[in-house]
Structures are given as C-alpha cells and as structure tokens.
Swiss-Prot record:
It holds the Pfam family Ribosomal_L3. It comes from Fusobacterium nucleatum subsp. nucleatum (strain ATCC 25586 / DSM 15643 / BCRC 10681 / CIP 101130 / JCM 8532 / KCTC 2640 / LMG 13131 / VPI 4355). One of its GO terms (molecular function) is rRNA binding. The gene is rplC. Part of the 50S ribosomal subunit. Forms a cluster with proteins L14 and L19. This is Large ribosomal subunit protein uL3. Coiled coil: none annotated. Gene3D superfamilies: 3.30.160.810, Translation factors. Belongs to the universal ribosomal protein uL3 family.
Length: 211
C-alpha cells in the first residue's frame, strides 16, 4: 500500500530508553476504497480512498453516487493515492493503519496553519531596518524589490509580504514510534503540519535514512 489518510489528534510525549520523546498522535484509518483508477480507463493507476464518516445531508449527489457504488457511508476526506496495481483491492474494502506496521519512516503531507497576511519579517525572517539613525517609517519594510527600467518588473520568487501559511506542506522522514492497530493510531516522532483535527496523507518515506 502506498499510503493512508489520517487526522492529526494532537501532541504528547512518551518515555523511551530513559528519555522523553515528543510525538504527534495521528488517527490513521480506517480508510475505504471508493474507486479504482486504471491505466486503460483513466491513464494512470491509483486508488481513491475515503476517511472520516460524515452525514449524508452534507454530501453532494455526485459524491453520494460514488459512496453508494462502493457500499460505504459518506466520507469527509476523499483523496487519490497512486499505487503500482489495483489488483487485490475491492470497492468498499477497509484499509487500516496496520499497513504501516513494517514502515520505519514516513512522509506526511498536510495543510499548514494559516497566519493571515504577514510582513516580510514574520513571513520570511527579515531582520528589518535600524530603529533610528536615518531610518524613518521604514523599520519593518522589505526594502528594494527590483531594478529600474530594466527589467521593469519584479522578478518571480521575490520574497514579499502576503498570505502566510495555509499551504500544502510535506515533511519527510518522520520516525514511526508506534502503530496502535487496535485504535487505528500512529505515534510519529516530532511535529507534523497543520492544526488539530486537520487531515493528513501518510506515505512510506521516499528517501532512505542514513545512520
């Protein structure tokens, strides 16, 4: 399995080898297979998974058609995950957190906390200008944003003030401390993106951990 959908519950700490280890508790599953995407029909191979049951009255008719066909109740978080093959999977099949039992490290994708419109000092860590000595009303400004008549524009990627957070973020190589199959919980060492109760995509780590 290439991954599983989950929800961030919060952070706590456990005692391991004589040391406190900060961990994030993630509710991972059960997921349900809603659709199977094939190379012949869709041009790619993937599974559409659903997680976190919700009320039918809050579900659109197109989505209800998908849920009814799979024989599952409406799910709040629906996402496609690429797999090598859809063979062995059936519509409505339940996928639990134990698929990650043998996985030591994971990559987790979530939506970071939104912080609204922020200036360059908060958003990018600029040091700002001096408090006095020639500085007038420019203490927290970003300074020059480009050249003059050539190129006559602000270059792409220039760090400026604007929306801060509320973006898709992936954190790689997070250690799986414990898999609680009975309660569908994952204990992940360290922090993961997003606020409490935000949704996550958990996949086996792509990169190898050295050492």
């Amino acid at each position: 399995m290439s991954g599983i959908l989950g929800k961030k519950i919060g952070m706590t700490q456990i005692f391991e080898d004589g040391k406190f280890v900060p961990v994030t508790v993630v509710e991972a599953g059960p997921n349900f297979v809603l659709q199977k995407k094939t190379e012949e029909k869709d041009g790619y191979v993937a599974l559409q998974l659903g997680f976190d049951e919700k009320k039918e009255k809050n579900t659109t008719k197109p989505l209800m058609g998908i849920f009814n066909k799979a024989g599952v109740k409406p799910q709040r978080f629906v996402k496609e995950l690429e797999v090598e093959s859809v063979d062995g999977y059936e519509l409505g099949q339940e996928i639990k957190v134990d698929v990650l039992t043998e996985v030591g490290y994971v990559d987790i994708t979530g939506t970071s906390k939104g912080k609204g419109t922020s200036g360059v000092m908060k958003k990018h860590g600029f040091s700002g200008n001096r408090a006095s000595h020639g500085v007038s009303r420019n203490h927290r400004l970003g300074g020059s944003i480009g050249m003059s008549s050539w190129p006559g524009k602000v270059l792409k990627g220039k760090k400026m003030a604007g929306q801060h957070g509320n973006a898709t973020v992936t954190v790689q190589n997070l250690k799986v401390v414990k898999v609680d199959a009975e309660h569908n919980l994952l204990l992940i060492k360290g922090a993961v993106p997003g606020a409490k109760n935000s949704y996550l995509v958990i996949k086996p780590a792509v990169k190898k951990v050295i050492g």
